Amino acid sequence: MKLYCLSGLGTDERAFKHIHIEGVELVHVPWIDFKENESLQSYAKRLFEATKPEDDYNLIGLSFGGMIAAEWEKIKTPKTLILLSTMRDTKGLPIYIRVAGALNLHKIVPMSLVRYPNFISYFLFGITNNENKQVFKDILHDGDPKHLKWAMNSIANWRNYDKSNGIRIHGDKDRLLPMKKGMDHVISGGGHMIVLNN
């Protein structure tokens, strides 16, 4: 069985390095180039068309990738959909993201704060051990700063009011995207990067 994996903002397939499921082949979906002023919905549609998953595909989305997954679900419903550390619709986004989007505050965030993690980044993402800190650091450092900037803007302006039917897994100590009620599985003590830590 194939499981298509959509990673988070600024991350790649290394975010899923600890996931090993017998009989399951992880298919990591690489990000494609974005178009100027492109919406998250439009990008998700082009990414889906570029990936061409089979009819009965299975999908897992992490953080930003979970938002992309929610858009894929509207194009073709997956057999199984798992949403990790993410929100299934716009209403689930924290108020600080919605305010930042309304005021365009996300556009003035220096990329150095995003690409070069420090103790604040590790705190927000809930990354504690040195091995995972190094993995996280390498992933962000290798990311495309222009893609990061675009993705931050697309999240801040995401408009999706269709609630996904995916299986939602969230850490109850997620500081970046605080957990909402109604999660299917709660990871006790888990931060935003439960996929690495838990």
Predicted region positions:
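Active-site signature of alpha/beta-hydrolase-fold catalytic machinery across serine-
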Residues: 18, 71-75
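Catalytic histidine-centered segment of alpha/beta-hydrolase-like enzymes
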Residues: 37-38, 176, 186-198
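Gly/Ala-rich beta-loop-alpha elbow adjacent to hydrolase catalytic centers
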Residues: 60-69
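Short beta-strand/loop motif that positions the catalytic acidic residue
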Residues: 168-174
